[in-house]
Amino acid sequence: VLLTGVVPYGDMRLEAVRLAWQQNGVNEVLNEISIDTGYGLDDIAKDKFISTQLFTKIFTDTNIKKFKYDFEVQKQIVYLFGVSSDQKEVELVIEHAKEIKGVLDIINYIQSR
């Protein structure tokens, strides 16, 4: 389970992790929730812009199998996840994320099989 988002208090972050672990079948919880009281509409708009750009790049690239990957954008950080047996394809997804203006970091949780 990948947890992302922004909360104003640390106890809310811990509660999210606790709730994730309580679900049946959970083997791992990746906590990327950040604490920030200043996350506003401007930040949401930037994240949405990045998300839309990345979706378009992945969806229109004929070298990428679209349904193997998913992503989340929080505070201009792109979190990639999915499962792939094709390392070149993974590198292409990462490269598309790097090309987008405003991306501060890319966290790759794509598992190789």
Model regions: which residues?
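N-terminal targeting leaders
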Residues: V1-R113
